[in-house]
Regions:
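C-terminal and inter-domain tail/linker signature
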Residues: 1-134
């Protein structure tokens, strides 16, 4: 079977998830547009629209604080073209004696330089996510 080259946005996404797993905010910062908008659906205390890199990094900090640093992402697959990147992930975490283990889909739109301009997270069970993070 012939091997095909990965789309550049697949490579960037893999770099981003690897940087997140290592807590490498400098590397993540290079992958984000300055005016990035990060959408986290639901009605929990971490839900909302985070605008700009500082707000996104603040969200990451809040996520780690809420889970005592246990929040992890496992990438299952990444699909991409010039306009979208879709990543299927498994999320795990622990919080207040509860365990979180869920599938999610992350959708990003890159800017002309390939940096993430907009991000959406879609949970397998948004009600359960709201309960876990509340």
């Amino acid at each position: 079977m012939a091997t095909t080259a990965q789309h550049a946005n697949v490579q960037r996404a893999r770099q981003g998830y690897e940087a997140f797993s290592k807590g490498d905010m400098a590397a993540i910062g290079e992958l984000l547009a300055d005016d990035v908008v990060w959408h986290v659906g639901g009605s929990s205390p971490i839900s909302g629209d985070y605008k700009g890199k500082d707000a996104v990094f603040g969200f990451f900090g809040k996520l780690m604080e809420q889970t005592g640093g246990t929040f992890k992402l496992e990438v299952h697959d990444i699909l991409a073209n010039d306009e979208h990147t879709v990543t299927m992930v498994r999320e795990t975490a622990a919080r207040n004696g509860k365990k979180w283990d869920s599938k999610a889909v992350h959708v990003t739109h890159p800017d002309s330089a390939g940096r993430i301009k907009e991000f959406w997270a879609f949970q397998e069970n948004s009600t359960a996510a709201d309960e876990f993070f509340s």
